[in-house]
């Protein structure tokens, strides 16, 4: 077992299993960039190891349609070019991504429509339907010459999932009876006691929460939760309201679900334009942006920046979601903005209108009892999640052993005693407009410096003897404003003249020496003024005798 993503972090899942000289890849997901990567939205696993083993990869099996499990396929597939296997719903989502990337016709995509095992080289893979917060989540029973692995993917036990079947406990029990060498198990909610709750209870609570409202009702939730979408539609119908979807990602998941046979009993939702023409007290909107994303519909609506939707005093916004760690500040700002506009805000803290799609401790214990694995391998979590599930499985639940693996570890699962064999290269790639770049690349380091310290640009116009024939020109970005900016620029330009005078007093300077001297002078002035160390660039323009060209114009040519 070699995890390339998802072990030591939540998101970006990619795991490889190897035996008999062949490799099976499970999932290929992305994660969202944080503030340390300015200008970057998406991060994917570094597939260097998979690329080196590309000829021996027998297939990529996708467990389900969440972005952290399939969102990197269209970015990375060219690196390993193996067949891809997915159920109809996940395949429908993936096809649109492959089409956008221009590789739809290149990828050998197999849509798995039944329970027949996949024969992939030395691996025999059987899909097991489990409940999750999106459709068609599949655990994988992976038979190998040295034992069977059960890779759970993301899952929970829910007797009323509302859309799709309940988790197939009979299949899990049957595999447990045959013998499971290792249970590779979701760790996301290891710190949550009890159970994760039922989608059926959320539906009932949403219906109650919407009843009796006078103004516009807005619900915001994760777009991929199709059962929650259907629950919002039921709440609208029960309250005598028209149901509308606002946000492209909601329409994407709705249309994918309809195309593969779900939501067939549900009336077509209105779009935002159609909803805007209806009486406000007769409409329920389901919107994207439950995490306060700047480009999500909810943030635009709250900021009165949406072309069709306007909130008024007395309306209500229902957040049928949890706050993902790291989004707290953004969401509280959104809540405050709504409150200031006298919009009622309802969250999961107020009413039970959200449940997780991942197992809490009682569900994990039940999974262990059903499967009875020889060993537990926690995945899908930060280090603290993995370590705690390993402890919980062995100390609290009596499993024989557990092993914590992090991205890049090579863990031998069999035959014989499990042991770490070494490590492979791992890392993160940022999805940039120019392509995939290492998150440690100089380009991104410069962006971070720009975002934190600002920038300074210098133009020097000199003659053949390196003497200034125009005053230095300095521009500062993101460093100061107004009078402070003008004073700082004046100080910087005087410092350049002073330092260049010292250099040319010794000997004629070349362009590099002039530029380095000017950069040092400006950085020193700025650092002394406000402690910043700006990204600083200098263009040196040499002119023939008698030539006079404005430095500002030449700057455009120089860069």
Predicted regions and their residues:
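His/Asp/Glu-rich metal-coordinating catalytic cores
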Residues: 2-61, 66-278, 296-310, 329-333
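A glycine- and charged-residue-rich anion-binding loop/surface
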Residues: 7, 31-35, 41-45, 56-57, ...
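Short acidic-glycine loop/turn motifs at beta-strand connectors
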Residues: 18-21, 144-146, 237, 414-416, ...
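Short glycine-rich phosphate-binding loop at a beta-alpha junction
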Residues: 83, 377-378, 537-540
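Conserved hydrophobic residues forming the short capping helix/wall of the S-adenosyl-L-methionine
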Residues: 98, 393, 526
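Hard-cation-handling environments
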Residues: 191-320, 324-349, 353-507, 515, ...
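C-terminal tails and terminal domains of large nucleic-acid-associated
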Residues: 507-544
């Amino acid at each position: 077992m070699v995890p390339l993503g998802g072990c030591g972090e939540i998101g970006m899942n990619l795991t490889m299993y190897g035996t008999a000289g062949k490799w099976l890849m499970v999932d290929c997901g992305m994660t969202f960039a944080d503030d340390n990567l300015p200008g970057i939205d998406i991060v994917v696993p570094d597939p260097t190891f998979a690329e080196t083993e590309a000829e021996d990869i027998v297939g990529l099996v996708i467990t389900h349609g969440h972005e952290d499990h399939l969102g990197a396929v269209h970015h990375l597939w060219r690196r390993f070019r193996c067949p891809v296997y997915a159920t109809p719903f996940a395949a429908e989502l993936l096809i649109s991504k492959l089409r956008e990337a221009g590789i739809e016709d290149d990828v050998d995509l197999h849509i798995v429509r039944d329970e027949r095992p996949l024969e992939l080289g030395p691996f025999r893979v059987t899909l097991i339907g489990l409940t999750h917060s999106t459709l068609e989540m599949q655990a994988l029973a992976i038979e190998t010459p040295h034992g069977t692995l059960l890779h759970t993917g993301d899952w929970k036990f829910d007797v009323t999932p509302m859309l799709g079947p309940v988790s197939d406990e009979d299949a899990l029990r049957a595999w447990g009876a045959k013998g499971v060498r290792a249970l590779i198990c979701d760790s996301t909610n290891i710190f949550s006691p009890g159970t994760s709750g039922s989608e059926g209870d959320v539906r009932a609570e949403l219906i109650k929460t919407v009843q009796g409202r006078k103004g516009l009702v807005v619900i915001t939730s994760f777009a991929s939760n199709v059962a929650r979408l259907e629950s919002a539609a039921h709440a609208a119908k029960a309250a005598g309201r028209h149901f509308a979807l606002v946000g492209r990602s909601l329409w994407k998941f709705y249309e994918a679900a309809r195309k593969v046979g779900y939501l067939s009993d549900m009336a077509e939702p209105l779009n935002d334009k159609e909803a805007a023409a209806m009486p406000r007290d007769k409409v329920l909107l389901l919107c994207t942006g439950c995490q306060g994303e700047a480009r999500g519909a909810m943030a635009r609506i709250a900021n009165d920046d949406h072309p069709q939707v306007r909130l008024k005093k007395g309306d209500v916004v229902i957040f049928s979601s949890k706050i993902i760690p790291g989004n707290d500040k953004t969401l509280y700002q959104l809540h405050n903005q709504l409150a200031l506009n006298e919009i009622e805000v309802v969250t999961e803290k107020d009413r039970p209108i959200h449940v997780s799609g991942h197992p809490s401790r009682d569900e994990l214990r039940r999974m262990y009892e059903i499967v009875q694995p020889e060993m537990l391998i926690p995945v899908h979590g930060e280090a603290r999640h993995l370590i705690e599930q390993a402890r919980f499985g062995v100390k609290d639940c009596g499993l024989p052993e557990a092993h914590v693996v992090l991205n890049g570890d090579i863990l031998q699962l069999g035959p014989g005693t499990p042991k770490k064999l070494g490590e492979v290269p791992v890392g993160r790639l940022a999805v940039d407009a120019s392509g995939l770049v290492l998150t440690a690349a100089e380009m991104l380091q410069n962006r971070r410096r720009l975002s934190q310290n600002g920038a300074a640009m210098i133009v020097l116009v000199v003659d053949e003897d390196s003497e200034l024939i125009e005053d230095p020109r300095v521009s500062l970005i993101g460093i100061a404003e107004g009078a402070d900016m003008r004073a700082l620029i004046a100080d910087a330009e005087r410092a350049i003249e002073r330092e260049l005078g010292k250099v040319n007093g010794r000997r004629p300077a070349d362009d590099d020496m002039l530029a380095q001297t000017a950069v040092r002078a400006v950085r020193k002035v700025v650092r002394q003024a406000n402690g910043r160390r700006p990204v600083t660039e200098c263009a040196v323009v040499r002119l023939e005798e008698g030539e006079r060209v404005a430095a500002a114009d030449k700057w455009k040519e120089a860069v």
